[in-house]
Amino acid sequence: MTETPNTSSEEIQTSEPSPDNELQVLQQENANLKAELQEQNDRYLMALAEAENSRKRLQKERTEMMQYAVENALMDFLPPIESMEKALGFASQTSEEVKNWAIGFQMILQQFKQIFEEKGVVEYSSKGELFNPYLHEAVEIEETTTIPEGTILEEFTKGYKIGDRPIRVAKVKVAKLPAKGNSDSNEEKE
């Protein structure tokens, strides 16, 4: 005797997916894969942007480090250059032989100044200007009523900058109005 299966043809049809169900499943899988692909693409683009930003940041840092290194090296040359300028200022008051030597030193000084210029270092003058703490260091204050307060009366050391950024501020003497108590007592003495 042979056994017949207990399943009917209706049951077989329900266990097999219908074409509509299969289409829905495939569409859902397709949508999931598209979403996953978009997510992976977004991650890739973010990683690419981060890498580009890192590259730019490192390049900027490298450029700044080089600029600061150049500035520091140039700053070391400022005192000897200024000493040479002062010495050359006295050369005109000496013998012909010293004057001839001074011409050679003047040429050397010009070469230094040319290097500074090529590197963007600019000397700025301060006398007669208004005091700016970003560009000046007040090392002396003189009370006066004839010159507006904050005006620079004398420059002890020159200031130098690259672009708008000072690499060495000028050391200066600044005018200040006398305190009211001081001006009254000065008038009484006269």
Swiss-Prot record:
Keyword line: Chaperone, Cytoplasm, Stress response
Compartment list: Cytoplasm
Biased composition regions of type Polar residues, renumbered to the chain: 1-18
Any one GO biological process: protein folding
Chief location category: cytoplasm
GO cellular component terms listed in the entry, alphabetical order: cytoplasm
Gene3D superfamilies registered for this protein in UniProt: 3.90.20.20, Head domain of nucleotide exchange factor GrpE
Pfam families with a match to the protein in the record: GrpE (PF01025)
GO molecular function: adenyl-nucleotide exchange factor activity; protein homodimerization activity; protein-folding chaperone binding; unfolded protein binding
Region (Disordered) location: 1-21
Annotated signal peptide: none
InterPro entries with a match to the protein in the record: GrpE (IPR000740), GrpE_coiled_coil (IPR013805), GrpE_head (IPR009012)
HAMAP family in the cross-refs: GrpE
Function: Participates actively in the response to hyperosmotic and heat shock by preventing the aggregation of stress-denatured proteins, in association with DnaK and GrpE. It is the nucleotide exchange factor for DnaK and may function as a thermosensor. Unfolded proteins bind initially to DnaJ; upon interaction with the DnaJ-bound protein, DnaK hydrolyzes its bound ATP, resulting in the formation of a stable complex. GrpE releases ADP from DnaK; ATP binding to DnaK triggers the release of the substrate protein, thus completing the reaction cycle.
Family named by the database record: Belongs to the GrpE family.
Subunit structure: Homodimer.
Protein name: Protein GrpE
Organism the protein comes from: Chlamydia trachomatis serovar D (strain ATCC VR-885 / DSM 19411 / UW-3/Cx)
